């Protein structure tokens, strides 16, 4: 494999509660949050239920010599784990940031490879939502059949229950939905 290409790695099982609370709130401007987390679940045709799905968490790699966005980490991992392109897959992502234009393009190409895969993306925040290039990337995903939405309270609770190492702590929605209404309206406007 070329050294500049993302290499597959194993996803994390869960993330720390403080990491979740810091990186996932619906915020317009999230200073200091340079990492992107991607929580995923993969359901195959035989197991279209959450109980039997493959799930985990990817985080972007920020090393200058081996940069890899969380979406790229997932795509590389998925191709290794699920080489059969004619099977049916239902994939759900919960992202702390929406995809950049490059990742959006790579996801569209990935969906052309896996024609029987449905992808739903629930994102906490919109990355550079005012930039036309980022808007175009989201539109390309939408046009490719990707379900796109801003994470709701139910989505946050699902992530807490399935992707956070909460050690029995109860889910608290405090501050997670701060700018939900604005972000949801902005996404709808972009996709119109």
Curated annotation (Swiss-Prot):
The record's misc note reads:
One of 3 related APOBEC3C genes in cat, APOBEC3Ca, APOBEC3Cb and APOBEC3Cc, which are likely to have been generated after two consecutive gene duplications. Potent inhibitor of Bet-deficient foamy feline virus. Does not inhibit Vif-deficient feline immunodeficiency virus.
Q: Which UniProt keywords apply?
A: Antiviral defense, Cytoplasm, Hydrolase, Metal-binding, Nucleus, Zinc
An example of a Pfam family matching this protein is: APOBEC2
Native species: Felis catus
Which residue numbers delimit the CMP/dCMP-type deaminase domain? 15-141
What role is this protein assigned? DNA deaminase (cytidine deaminase) which acts as an inhibitor of retrovirus replication and retrotransposon mobility via deaminase-dependent and -independent mechanisms. Selectively targets single-stranded DNA and does not deaminate double-stranded DNA or single- or double-stranded RNA. Does not reduce infectivity of foamy feline virus, feline immunodeficiency virus or feline leukemia virus.
Identify the residues that bind Zn(2+): 69, 100, 103
Where do the catalytic residues lie? 71 (proton donor)
Q: Where in the cell is it found?
A: Nucleus; Cytoplasm
The record's annotation in CDD domains points to: cytidine_deaminase
Q: Which cofactor does it need?
A: Zn(2+)
One of the GO BP terms on file: DNA cytosine deamination
Q: Outline the subunit composition.
A: (Microbial infection) Interacts with feline foamy virus protein Bet. This interaction does not induce APOBEC3Ca degradation but prevents its dimerization and incorporation into the virion.
Instruction: Supply the name of the protein.
Output: DNA dC->dU-editing enzyme APOBEC-3Ca
The Swiss-Prot or TrEMBL record annotates one GO molecular function as: zinc ion binding
């Amino acid at each position: 494999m070329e050294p500049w290409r993302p290499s597959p790695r194993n996803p994390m099982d869960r993330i720390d509660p403080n990491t979740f609370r810091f990186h996932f709130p619906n915020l317009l401007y999230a200073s200091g949050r340079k990492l992107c987390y991607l929580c995923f679940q993969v359901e195959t045709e035989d197991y279209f239920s959450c109980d039997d799905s493959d799930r985990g968490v990817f985080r972007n790699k920020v090393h200058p010599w081996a940069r890899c966005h969380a979406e790229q980490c997932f795509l590389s991992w998925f191709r290794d784990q699920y080489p059969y392109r004619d099977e049916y897959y239902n994939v759900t992502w919960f992202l702390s940031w929406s995809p950049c234009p490059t990742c959006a393009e790579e996801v569209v190409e990935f969906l052309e490879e896996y024609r029987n895969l449905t992808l739903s993306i629930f994102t906490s925040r919109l990355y550079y939502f005012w930039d036309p290039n980022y808007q175009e990337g989201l539109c390309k995903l939408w046009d490719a059949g990707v379900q796109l939405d801003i994470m709701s309270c139910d989505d946050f609770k699902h992530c807490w229950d399935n992707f956070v190492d909460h050690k029995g702590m109860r889910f608290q929605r405090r501050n997670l939905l701060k700018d939900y209404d604005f972000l949801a309206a902005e996404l709808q406007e972009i996709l119109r």
